[in-house]
């Protein structure tokens, strides 16, 4: 993962109200708001915005922490460490930030878990946040055998949308014509639970796909997918997979990019296709989804609307000819010949799938565009066509407040912290770090991610593999 570079411009933290709308462009003399307006169709403005955020990382980070503290010093959690007397004695934002770093401990999830569980059971959000907690995001990590729960506010969806809006402008620097077709992205929702208080707990991607930010997104060639939303939102993952592949094959000639969030999910789709291509071809010939397979009414109706305009026996025969061949080497490129790249995360634990992706992809570039977790969305890949083993993510300093704890390996290979906490622009090239994240709800929690700085511009992941910045 990469961090951002040190700032080179004077600080103007108060030039804009963080809640006011602003264009994506920003001059060196003014910081953009915390969630800037960002039009993915205006590539130059988006790239300029990235430049402003990253070159002025220190100023942006100071503003993030100031906003976090301005909002949350009255919460039960922060009042334990920053009481009224401490807040009153702080003469300004810098003094309050210093008190935060001195008095608020870096904790593990287990330390804030009791607060989150109380909110899940009906306690007010003000235990940890000045803004209403609207949902709980489940993490892939566990605590006591149960998924970890991360509190989230409505504003977090705005932050995620902002980061998503930056991805296409970056890709457009390297790949032309992405507005001339569709993306075949295989996206899925997972089961959610309702807590005792009635609050929903669900995975971060499920939260986003069910939000108005995704479902009511503006029509754009960059967010035009082969899958109708009803297929993505189908709660039955098997039906969803079948329906999305069916639409992707039916719209074969329009597909310019393919992908899923993780490499493993994309490969599951390829394996599913390998076992079901005959049935999928039969549905394309018939111009409708088999009602015995796609039983979800909304999903089937949306898929049938796609197929009705494309009932094409010749297309089915062409797909069958590719799938029925002696080898599936390069099958992705052969089935979707206009495809320019495969968009999946191939860093960290997903790196093990690179050989299979290369086998099925037939030479298509493997692109990891972003890095995120349940705590926060962190950063983007500014050199997306670099080989997978050289991927570097650039942390966006407006997404949360970042700190780092240097770690060393002892004689047994175990990590040992040195105790010193440094901020985003204070990391040293060549050292390993654990990430500490303070989100806009105010907890200063050690994240399960390790980072390795590759240059003054960033940190890479995973920590056990050197990445050249």
From Swiss-Prot:
Stretches the record annotates as Disordered: 1-26
Keywords: Ligase
Domain of life, source organism: Eukaryota
Induction: By auxin.
Record GO terms (molecular function): acid-amino acid ligase activity
Gene Ontology terms: cellular component: cytoplasm
Protein name: Probable indole-3-acetic acid-amido synthetase GH3.13
């Amino acid at each position: 993962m990469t961090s951002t570079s040190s700032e080179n411009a004077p600080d103007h933290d108060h030039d804009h109200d963080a809640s006011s709308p602003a264009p994506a462009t920003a001059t060196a003399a003014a910081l953009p708001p915390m969630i800037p307006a960002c039009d993915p169709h205006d590539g130059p403005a988006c790239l300029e915005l990235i430049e402003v955020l990253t070159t002025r990382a220190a100023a942006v980070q100071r503003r993030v922490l100031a906003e976090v503290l301005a909002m949350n010093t009255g919460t039960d959690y922060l009042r334990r460490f920053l009481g009224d007397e401490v807040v009153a004695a702080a003469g300004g934002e810098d003094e309050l930030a210093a008190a935060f770093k001195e008095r608020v401990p870096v904790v593990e999830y287990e330390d804030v878990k009791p607060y989150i569980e109380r909110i899940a059971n009906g306690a007010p959000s003000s235990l940890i946040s000045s803004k209403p907690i609207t949902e709980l995001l489940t993490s892939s990590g566990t605590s006591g055998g149960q998924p970890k729960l991360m509190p989230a506010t409505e504003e977090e969806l705005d932050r995620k949308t902002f980061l998503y809006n930056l991805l296409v402008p970056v890709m457009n620097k390297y790949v032309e014509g992405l507005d001339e077709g569709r993306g075949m992205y295989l996206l899925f929702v997972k089961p959610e639970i309702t807590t005792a208080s009635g609050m929903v707990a669900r995975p971060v991607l499920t939260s986003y796909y069910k939000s108005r930010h995704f479902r009511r997104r503006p029509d754009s060639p960059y967010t035009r997918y082969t899958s109708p939303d009803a297929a993505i939102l189908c709660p039955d993952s098997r039906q969803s997979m079948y329906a999305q592949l069916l639409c992707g094959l039916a719209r074969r000639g329009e597909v310019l990019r393919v992908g899923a969030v993780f490499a493993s999910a994309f490969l599951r789709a390829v394996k599913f296709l390998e076992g079901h291509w005959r049935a999928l071809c039969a549905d394309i010939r018939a111009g409708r989804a088999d009602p015995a397979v796609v039983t979800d009414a909304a999903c089937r109706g949306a898929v049938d609307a796609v197929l009705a305009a494309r009932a094409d026996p010749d297309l089915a025969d062409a797909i069958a000819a590719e799938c029925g061949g002696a080898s599936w080497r390069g099958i992705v490129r052969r089935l979707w010949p206009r495809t320019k790249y495969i968009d999946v995360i191939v860093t960290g634990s997903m790196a093990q799938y690179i050989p299979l992706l290369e086998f099925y992809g037939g030479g298509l570039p493997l692109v990891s565009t972003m890095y995120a977790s349940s705590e926060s969305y962190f950063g983007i890949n500014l050199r997306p066509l670099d080989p997978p083993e050289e991927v570097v993510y650039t942390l966006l300093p407006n997404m949360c407040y970042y700190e780092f704890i240097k770690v060393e390996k002892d004689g047994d290979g175990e990590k040992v912290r040195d105790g010193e906490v440094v901020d985003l622009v204070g990391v040293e090239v060549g050292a390993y770090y654990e990430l500490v994240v303070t989100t806009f709800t105010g907890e200063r929690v050690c994240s399960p991610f390790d980072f390795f700085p590759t240059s003054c511009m960033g940190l890479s992941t995973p920590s056990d593999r050197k990445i050249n910045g």
